[in-house]
Protein backbone atom coordinates (compact mmCIF):
# COMPACT_ATOMS: atom_id res chain seq x y z
CA UNK A 1 0.00 0.00 0.00
CA UNK A 2 1.17 3.51 -0.83
CA UNK A 3 1.28 6.43 1.62
CA UNK A 4 1.24 9.73 -0.25
CA UNK A 5 1.39 13.22 1.21
CA UNK A 6 3.23 16.53 0.96
CA UNK A 7 5.68 18.76 2.80
CA UNK A 8 3.18 20.68 4.90
CA UNK A 9 3.49 23.89 6.89
CA UNK A 10 4.32 23.93 10.60
CA UNK A 11 3.18 27.54 10.90
CA UNK A 12 1.92 28.25 14.41
CA UNK A 13 3.69 25.16 15.74
CA UNK A 14 4.84 21.74 14.54
CA UNK A 15 1.73 20.24 16.19
CA UNK A 16 -0.38 21.78 13.38
CA UNK A 17 1.39 19.75 10.69
CA UNK A 18 -0.68 16.52 11.02
CA UNK A 19 -3.93 18.52 10.69
CA UNK A 20 -2.56 20.35 7.65
CA UNK A 21 -1.75 16.96 6.13
CA UNK A 22 -5.23 15.61 6.90
CA UNK A 23 -6.80 18.69 5.24
CA UNK A 24 -5.25 17.78 1.86
CA UNK A 25 -6.14 14.08 2.06
CA UNK A 26 -2.59 12.97 2.87
CA UNK A 27 -1.65 9.60 4.38
CA UNK A 28 1.94 10.78 5.00
CA UNK A 29 3.72 14.11 5.33
CA UNK A 30 7.03 15.91 5.66
CA UNK A 31 7.65 18.89 7.92
CA UNK A 32 10.57 20.96 9.14
CA UNK A 33 11.39 19.88 12.70
CA UNK A 34 12.12 23.55 13.44
CA UNK A 35 12.40 26.81 11.47
CA UNK A 36 14.58 25.83 8.50
CA UNK A 37 16.18 29.28 8.25
CA UNK A 38 17.34 29.59 11.86
CA UNK A 39 20.25 27.89 13.60
CA UNK A 40 18.70 27.79 17.06
CA UNK A 41 15.09 27.28 18.12
CA UNK A 42 13.57 27.16 21.58
CA UNK A 43 13.13 23.64 22.96
CA UNK A 44 9.89 21.81 22.22
CA UNK A 45 7.36 22.27 25.00
CA UNK A 46 5.64 19.22 26.46
CA UNK A 47 2.21 20.54 25.40
CA UNK A 48 3.44 20.85 21.77
CA UNK A 49 4.76 17.29 21.82
CA UNK A 50 1.48 15.95 23.25
CA UNK A 51 -0.59 17.97 20.76
CA UNK A 52 1.54 16.70 17.85
CA UNK A 53 1.03 13.06 18.88
CA UNK A 54 -2.71 13.60 19.45
CA UNK A 55 -3.13 15.34 16.07
CA UNK A 56 -1.19 12.54 14.38
CA UNK A 57 -3.76 10.07 15.75
CA UNK A 58 -6.63 12.34 14.69
CA UNK A 59 -5.19 12.47 11.17
CA UNK A 60 -4.81 8.67 11.12
CA UNK A 61 -1.16 8.97 10.12
CA UNK A 62 1.46 6.64 11.57
CA UNK A 63 4.77 8.08 12.87
CA UNK A 64 6.67 5.92 10.34
CA UNK A 65 4.90 7.78 7.50
CA UNK A 66 6.26 11.14 8.64
CA UNK A 67 9.51 12.28 7.03
CA UNK A 68 10.83 15.37 8.84
CA UNK A 69 13.40 17.50 7.00
CA UNK A 70 16.37 19.24 8.60
CA UNK A 71 17.32 22.91 8.20
CA UNK A 72 18.77 24.07 4.88
CA UNK A 73 21.51 25.88 6.84
CA UNK A 74 23.12 22.61 7.91
CA UNK A 75 26.15 21.41 5.91
CA UNK A 76 27.60 18.24 7.44
CA UNK A 77 30.56 18.42 5.04
CA UNK A 78 31.48 22.08 5.61
CA UNK A 79 35.21 22.74 5.01
CA UNK A 80 35.42 25.36 7.81
CA UNK A 81 35.72 23.90 11.31
CA UNK A 82 33.51 26.47 13.04
CA UNK A 83 30.65 26.12 10.55
CA UNK A 84 31.01 22.34 10.56
CA UNK A 85 30.66 22.25 14.36
CA UNK A 86 27.63 24.55 14.15
CA UNK A 87 26.05 22.24 11.56
CA UNK A 88 26.74 19.14 13.62
CA UNK A 89 25.24 20.67 16.78
CA UNK A 90 22.11 21.80 14.89
CA UNK A 91 21.74 18.36 13.27
CA UNK A 92 21.96 16.58 16.62
CA UNK A 93 19.33 18.99 18.01
CA UNK A 94 17.00 18.11 15.13
CA UNK A 95 17.49 14.37 15.70
CA UNK A 96 16.55 14.92 19.35
CA UNK A 97 13.44 16.88 18.33
CA UNK A 98 12.31 14.04 16.05
CA UNK A 99 12.79 11.59 18.91
CA UNK A 100 10.74 13.82 21.27
CA UNK A 101 7.92 13.89 18.70
CA UNK A 102 7.95 10.08 18.49
CA UNK A 103 9.24 10.08 14.90
CA UNK A 104 11.85 7.66 13.57
CA UNK A 105 13.42 9.50 10.59
CA UNK A 106 15.24 12.74 9.77
CA UNK A 107 15.73 13.51 6.09
CA UNK A 108 18.78 15.62 5.16
CA UNK A 109 20.84 16.76 2.19
CA UNK A 110 24.33 15.26 2.56
CA UNK A 111 26.39 18.45 2.23
CA UNK A 112 28.53 20.58 -0.07
CA UNK A 113 32.32 20.72 -0.43
CA UNK A 114 32.28 24.47 -1.39
CA UNK A 115 35.69 24.17 -3.13
CA UNK A 116 36.03 26.46 -6.15
CA UNK A 117 37.92 24.71 -8.96
CA UNK A 118 38.23 26.57 -12.28
CA UNK A 119 36.75 24.48 -15.13
CA UNK A 120 39.82 25.24 -17.28
CA UNK A 121 42.23 23.80 -14.69
CA UNK A 122 43.99 20.87 -16.45
CA UNK A 123 43.58 18.83 -13.25
CA UNK A 124 39.92 19.81 -12.82
CA UNK A 125 38.54 16.24 -12.68
CA UNK A 126 41.24 14.98 -10.28
CA UNK A 127 40.76 17.98 -7.96
CA UNK A 128 36.97 17.63 -8.09
CA UNK A 129 37.12 13.93 -7.21
CA UNK A 130 39.51 14.69 -4.33
CA UNK A 131 37.24 17.47 -2.98
CA UNK A 132 34.15 15.23 -3.24
CA UNK A 133 35.78 12.23 -1.56
CA UNK A 134 37.13 14.33 1.30
CA UNK A 135 33.72 15.96 1.80
CA UNK A 136 31.94 12.57 1.78
CA UNK A 137 34.29 11.37 4.52
CA UNK A 138 33.57 14.51 6.59
CA UNK A 139 29.81 13.94 6.14
CA UNK A 140 30.18 10.29 7.22
CA UNK A 141 32.13 11.43 10.29
CA UNK A 142 29.35 13.94 11.06
CA UNK A 143 26.78 11.14 10.79
CA UNK A 144 28.75 8.85 13.09
CA UNK A 145 29.13 11.65 15.66
CA UNK A 146 25.39 12.40 15.48
CA UNK A 147 24.50 8.73 15.94
CA UNK A 148 26.88 8.49 18.91
CA UNK A 149 25.38 11.65 20.46
CA UNK A 150 21.82 10.25 20.18
CA UNK A 151 22.58 6.68 21.27
CA UNK A 152 19.33 6.05 23.12
CA UNK A 153 17.30 7.02 20.06
CA UNK A 154 16.27 5.01 16.99
CA UNK A 155 15.82 8.03 14.68
CA UNK A 156 17.28 7.14 11.31
CA UNK A 157 19.49 9.55 9.36
CA UNK A 158 17.82 9.53 5.94
CA UNK A 159 20.19 10.78 3.22
CA UNK A 160 18.45 12.52 0.32
CA UNK A 161 19.94 12.22 -3.15
CA UNK A 162 20.56 15.59 -4.79
CA UNK A 163 20.55 17.12 -8.26
CA UNK A 164 24.26 17.92 -7.86
CA UNK A 165 23.74 21.65 -8.23
CA UNK A 166 26.80 23.72 -7.32
CA UNK A 167 29.05 21.67 -5.03
CA UNK A 168 26.22 19.58 -3.50
CA UNK A 169 27.07 15.92 -3.02
CA UNK A 170 24.64 13.01 -3.22
CA UNK A 171 23.96 13.25 -6.97
CA UNK A 172 25.45 9.82 -7.64
CA UNK A 173 24.12 6.62 -6.10
CA UNK A 174 27.79 5.88 -5.34
CA UNK A 175 27.87 8.90 -2.99
CA UNK A 176 24.98 7.44 -0.98
CA UNK A 177 26.65 4.01 -0.90
CA UNK A 178 29.94 5.57 0.27
CA UNK A 179 28.20 7.27 3.20
CA UNK A 180 26.31 4.12 4.19
CA UNK A 181 29.52 2.09 4.03
CA UNK A 182 31.29 4.56 6.36
CA UNK A 183 28.46 4.72 8.92
CA UNK A 184 29.20 2.33 11.76
CA UNK A 185 25.61 1.71 12.94
CA UNK A 186 23.79 0.86 9.71
CA UNK A 187 20.50 0.36 11.58
CA UNK A 188 20.40 4.17 11.92
CA UNK A 189 20.81 5.09 8.24
CA UNK A 190 18.49 5.24 5.23
CA UNK A 191 17.93 6.96 1.90
CA UNK A 192 15.24 9.21 0.40
CA UNK A 193 15.03 9.36 -3.40
CA UNK A 194 13.77 12.62 -4.90
CA UNK A 195 12.44 12.03 -8.42
CA UNK A 196 13.41 15.52 -9.65
CA UNK A 197 16.93 15.23 -8.20
CA UNK A 198 17.33 11.70 -9.58
CA UNK A 199 16.30 12.86 -13.05
CA UNK A 200 18.37 16.05 -13.19
CA UNK A 201 21.38 14.13 -11.84
CA UNK A 202 21.17 12.02 -15.00
CA UNK A 203 19.09 8.96 -14.05
CA UNK A 204 16.14 8.64 -16.42
CA UNK A 205 12.68 7.54 -15.20
CA UNK A 206 10.45 8.37 -18.17
CA UNK A 207 10.05 4.98 -19.86
CA UNK A 208 9.61 1.49 -18.45
CA UNK A 209 13.09 0.55 -19.66
CA UNK A 210 14.73 3.70 -18.26
CA UNK A 211 12.89 3.38 -14.92
CA UNK A 212 13.94 -0.26 -14.53
CA UNK A 213 17.54 0.59 -15.43
CA UNK A 214 17.67 3.39 -12.83
CA UNK A 215 16.04 1.30 -10.10
CA UNK A 216 18.29 -1.69 -10.90
CA UNK A 217 21.30 0.64 -10.50
CA UNK A 218 19.93 1.85 -7.16
CA UNK A 219 19.43 -1.74 -5.97
CA UNK A 220 22.91 -2.77 -7.11
CA UNK A 221 24.77 0.26 -5.70
CA UNK A 222 22.73 1.20 -2.61
CA UNK A 223 20.05 -1.45 -1.97
CA UNK A 224 16.30 -1.06 -1.52
CA UNK A 225 16.59 -2.12 2.12
CA UNK A 226 17.82 1.45 2.72
CA UNK A 227 14.94 3.21 0.91
CA UNK A 228 12.89 4.95 3.61
CA UNK A 229 11.03 7.61 1.67
CA UNK A 230 10.62 9.39 -1.65
CA UNK A 231 10.02 12.95 -2.75
CA UNK A 232 7.60 12.94 -5.68
CA UNK A 233 8.34 15.90 -7.94
CA UNK A 234 8.32 16.64 -11.64
CA UNK A 235 11.30 18.59 -12.99
CA UNK A 236 11.51 21.92 -14.79
CA UNK A 237 15.08 21.27 -16.05
CA UNK A 238 16.02 18.53 -18.49
CA UNK A 239 17.61 15.13 -17.80
CA UNK A 240 21.16 15.45 -16.47
CA UNK A 241 21.02 19.26 -16.18
CA UNK A 242 22.26 19.16 -12.54
CA UNK A 243 19.75 21.91 -11.68
CA UNK A 244 17.21 21.56 -8.85
CA UNK A 245 13.86 23.07 -9.89
CA UNK A 246 10.69 21.17 -9.02
CA UNK A 247 7.57 21.26 -11.20
CA UNK A 248 3.96 20.20 -10.58
CA UNK A 249 3.22 16.62 -11.63
CA UNK A 250 2.82 16.22 -15.38
CA UNK A 251 3.98 19.79 -15.99
CA UNK A 252 7.70 19.08 -16.20
CA UNK A 253 10.23 17.01 -18.10
CA UNK A 254 9.54 13.73 -16.27
CA UNK A 255 5.83 13.23 -16.98
CA UNK A 256 3.13 10.95 -15.60
CA UNK A 257 4.50 7.56 -16.71
CA UNK A 258 7.31 7.67 -14.13
CA UNK A 259 4.84 8.37 -11.32
CA UNK A 260 2.68 5.50 -12.53
CA UNK A 261 5.70 3.16 -12.34
CA UNK A 262 6.38 4.31 -8.75
CA UNK A 263 2.75 3.93 -7.63
CA UNK A 264 2.74 0.34 -8.93
CA UNK A 265 6.18 -0.63 -7.63
CA UNK A 266 5.85 -2.77 -4.46
CA UNK A 267 9.32 -1.60 -3.35
CA UNK A 268 7.73 1.79 -2.59
CA UNK A 269 5.04 0.30 -0.31
CA UNK A 270 4.72 1.46 3.30
CA UNK A 271 7.15 4.41 3.03
CA UNK A 272 6.28 8.13 2.91
CA UNK A 273 5.89 9.40 -0.68
CA UNK A 274 6.07 13.17 -0.31
CA UNK A 275 5.09 15.88 -2.78
CA UNK A 276 7.29 18.97 -2.83
CA UNK A 277 5.73 20.29 -6.02
CA UNK A 278 5.60 24.05 -6.46
CA UNK A 279 1.84 24.76 -6.36
CA UNK A 280 0.46 23.83 -2.93
CA UNK A 281 -3.10 24.43 -4.12
CA UNK A 282 -2.72 21.39 -6.40
CA UNK A 283 -1.63 19.00 -3.64
CA UNK A 284 -5.11 17.53 -2.92
CA UNK A 285 -5.56 16.88 -6.67
CA UNK A 286 -2.02 15.52 -7.09
CA UNK A 287 -2.52 13.11 -4.17
CA UNK A 288 -5.78 11.85 -5.70
CA UNK A 289 -4.17 11.61 -9.15
CA UNK A 290 -1.30 9.51 -7.78
CA UNK A 291 -3.68 7.08 -6.05
CA UNK A 292 -5.71 6.86 -9.27
CA UNK A 293 -2.59 5.48 -11.01
CA UNK A 294 -2.58 2.36 -8.82
CA UNK A 295 -3.60 -0.63 -10.95
CA UNK A 296 -6.23 -2.72 -9.25
UniProtKB/Swiss-Prot annotation:
UniProt binding sites for Zn(2+) 3: 197, 244, 246
Keyword DNA damage: yes
Pfam families assigned to the protein according to its UniProt record, in alphabetical order: AP_endonuc_2
InterPro entries in alphabetical order: AP_endonuc_2, AP_endonuc_F2_Zn_BS, Xyl_isomerase-like_sf, Xyl_isomerase-like_TIM-brl
Cofactor(s) in the UniProt record: Zn(2+)
Keyword Cell membrane: no
Residues spanning the membrane: none
SMART domains: AP2Ec
Enzyme nomenclature, EC number: 3.1.21.2
Residue positions binding Zn(2+) 1: 69, 109, 160
SUPFAM superfamilies according to UniProt: Xylose isomerase-like
A GO MF term: deoxyribonuclease IV (phage-T4-induced) activity
Chain's role: Endonuclease IV plays a role in DNA repair. It cleaves phosphodiester bonds at apurinic or apyrimidinic (AP) sites, generating a 3'-hydroxyl group and a 5'-terminal sugar phosphate.
Family: Belongs to the AP endonuclease 2 family.
PANTHER family: APURINIC-APYRIMIDINIC ENDONUCLEASE (PTHR21445:SF0), ENDONUCLEASE IV ENDODEOXYRIBONUCLEASE IV (PTHR21445)
Name used for this protein in its record: Probable endonuclease 4
UniProt organism field: Sulfurovum sp. (strain NBC37-1)
Protein encoded by which gene: nfo
